[in-house]
């Protein structure tokens, strides 16, 4: 039932905590509450929650759920695995014919939103500062490296020009039935607003 939450929470009109250190519940959060109750009452969702076993099973061969709100990283790292009838760890292959691999596709949602990201942190006091710097710069700033990450993992990486190049190329995802989902992400990403993020989001969301 909570898949759609980030569409609302990422499009609020103000941060969670105001200048007086007072928690403010945005109208958009209450719209999500109202919609969730309505959809639950009408049976539009399966009453499961993110990451629980029912939610995961609903994404597989026996699932009856029409669709899911997801992150870019979740497509390959979570949805793909859940789609397989025989998991890779049990000898299954990531290929058409194993469960519903190849049956999914990505479509544009009602609003652009983000769901976390992939982070890299360095330890304070490291005696390998230059090496750490090179690793971080390569993974986060080197266009060729980031394009390769996208091509290998299907995730959306931190290079606008690189993602636009992949979007206009013949790149395709076998898991997504041959779709170039990066083309859709490249269109949606510029519409994401980060102006109301705060240090309280992780706890309050």
Describe each PLM feature range.
Residues 52-68:
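Short helices/loops that flank or line small-molecule/ion binding pockets
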Residues 3, 27-35, 55, 64, ...:
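Extracytoplasmic/secreted proteins, especially bacterial periplasmic and envelope-associated proteins
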Residues 78-81, 110-205:
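C-terminal lobe and pocket-closing loops
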Residues 66-71, 105-108, 120-122:
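Structural recognition of the beta-strand scaffold that forms the well-ordered cores
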Residues 41-44, 62-67, 100-104, 128-134, ...:
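Loop/turn elements at helix/coil->beta-strand transitions in domains of secreted/extracellular proteins
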Residues 72-98:
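A ligand-binding cleft/hinge motif common to bilobed small-molecule-binding domains
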Residues 18-50, 93-106:
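Glycine-centered hinge/linker elements that transmit conformational signals in sensory
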Residues 1-22, 37, 63-67:
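Extracytoplasmic/periplasmic solute-binding protein
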């Amino acid at each position: 039932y909570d898949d759609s939450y980030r569409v609302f929470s990422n499009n609020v009109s103000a941060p969670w905590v105001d200048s007086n250190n007072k928690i403010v519940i945005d109208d958009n959060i209450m719209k999500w509450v109202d919609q969730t109750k309505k959809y639950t009452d009408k049976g539009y969702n399966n009453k499961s929650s993110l990451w629980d076993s029912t939610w995961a099973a609903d994404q597989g061969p026996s699932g009856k759920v029409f669709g899911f709100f997801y992150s870019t990283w979740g497509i390959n790292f979570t949805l793909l695995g859940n789609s397989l009838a025989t998991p890779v760890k049990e000898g299954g292959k990531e290929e058409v014919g194993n469960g519903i691999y190849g049956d999914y596709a990505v479509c544009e949602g009602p609003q652009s939103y983000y769901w976390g990201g992939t982070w890299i942190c360095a330890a304070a006091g490291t005696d390998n500062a230059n090496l750490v710097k090179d690793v971080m710069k390569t993974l986060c700033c080197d266009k060729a490296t980031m394009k390769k990450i996208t091509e290998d993992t299907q995730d959306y990486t931190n290079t606008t020009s690189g993602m636009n190049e992949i979007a206009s190329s013949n790149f395709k995802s076998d898991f997504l039935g041959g779709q170039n989902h990066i083309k859709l992400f490249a269109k949606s990403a510029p519409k994401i607003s980060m102006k109301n993020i705060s240090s309280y989001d992780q706890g309050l969301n």
